[in-house]
């Protein structure tokens, strides 16, 4: 399929862009014509390799721990100073606990870590991107990675689900508050796919994901990939979504259309 330059001229930041959904989205942003893509991540070797492969003049890696707001602010300010603006912020960095985290066995140390990254860290990213976009006065698009789990009760991963529900609340509130500045705020909610993140909860391959979710999605014969999610993000980042804000775009194969069935891991 020929590349369509729907992001031509835009400057984008992708947190968690060194691997998984973030990496694929960063590459797609560049393919769709983004003038510059900044990969903000904590994996210097992987992030640097991705940036170099996209093209050193139009893609940079910057170390960023999103739980440190000053680091987030620095990335945003550096991007604007280096590339002349910030048009798109994809708040994608996230984490999950390595254990089941049922209510009765909730490890609060892990809980705090997950909330610090997924909820607090995402809030810092939205805040700092919005600050710069308001300062520049030309609007912008902010997209956050939520999760299909926010629409269902879960048999485990309680802390993860709570954190992503927080992301959804952030997106809705931010879209209301920032609309006056021409800033759109949306989210994508994918089901699990084989990424370094889902490997921590036992979903290491596409076959693992298909086995886990295939029973509870209505769309058969298609397994979710990072490319599917990246396409959704690219749409929300583009001017084609100019009148879309406060929306959670499900990339879930129809999971929301069916009663949830707890699948044993």
Swiss-Prot record:
Peltate glandular trichomes. InterPro entries: NAD(P)-bd_dom_sf, SDR_fam. Optimum pH is 10. It catalyses: (1S,6R)-isopiperitenol + NAD(+) = (6R)-isopiperitenone + NADH + H(+); (1S,5R)-carveol + NADP(+) = (R)-carvone + NADPH + H(+). One of its GO terms (molecular function) is nucleotide binding. It comes from the Eukaryota. GO terms for cellular component: mitochondrion. Residues 1-30 form a transit peptide. NAD(+) binds at residues 13-38. Keywords: Mitochondrion, NAD, NADP, Oxidoreductase, Transit peptide. It holds the Pfam family adh_short_C2. The keyword Oxidoreductase applies. Transmembrane segments: none annotated. Substrate binds at residue 147. The keyword DNA damage does not apply. Involved in the biosynthesis of menthol and related monoterpenes in leaves. Can use (-)-trans-carveol and, with a lower relative velocity, (-)-trans-isopiperitenol, (+)-neomenthol, (+)-neoisomenthol and (-)-cis-isopiperitenol as substrates, but not (-)-cis-carvenol, (-)-menthol, (+)-isomenthol, 7-hydroxy-limonene, (-)-isopiperitenone or (-)-carvone. Can use both NAD(+) or NADP(+) as cofactor. Belongs to the short-chain dehydrogenases/reductases (SDR) family. This is (-)-isopiperitenol/(-)-carveol dehydrogenase, mitochondrial.
């Amino acid at each position: 399929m020929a590349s369509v330059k729907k992001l031509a001229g835009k400057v984008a930041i992708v947190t968690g862009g060194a691997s998984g959904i973030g990496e694929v989205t960063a590459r797609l942003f560049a393919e769709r014509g983004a003038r510059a893509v900044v990969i903000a991540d904590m994996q210097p070797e992987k992030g640097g390799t991705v940036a170099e492969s996209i093209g050193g003049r139009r893609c940079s890696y910057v170390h960023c721990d999103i739980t440190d707001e000053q680091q987030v602010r620095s990335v945003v300010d550096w991007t604007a100073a280096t590339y002349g603006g910030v048009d798109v912020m994809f708040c994608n960095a996230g984490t999950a606990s390595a254990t089941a985290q049922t209510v009765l066995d909730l490890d609060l140390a892990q809980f705090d870590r997950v909330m610090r990254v997924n909820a607090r860290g995402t809030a810092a990213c939205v805040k700092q991107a919005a600050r710069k976009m308001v300062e520049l006065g030309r609007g912008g698009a902010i997209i956050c990675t939520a999760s299909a789990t926010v629409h269902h009760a879960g048999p485990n991963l309680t802390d993860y689900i709570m954190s992503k529900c927080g992301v959804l609340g952030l997106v809705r509130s931010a879209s209301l508050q920032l609309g006056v500045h021409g800033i759109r705020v949306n989210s994508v909610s994918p089901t699990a796919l084989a990424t370094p993140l889902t490997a921590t909860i036992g979903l290491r391959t596409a076959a693992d994901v298909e086995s886990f979710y295939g029973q509870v999605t209505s769309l058969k014969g298609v397994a979710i990939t990072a490319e599917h999610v990246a396409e959704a993000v690219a749409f929300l980042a583009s001017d084609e979504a100019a009148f879309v804000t406060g929306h959670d775009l499900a990339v879930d194969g129809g999971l929301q259309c069916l009663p949830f069935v707890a699948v044993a891991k």
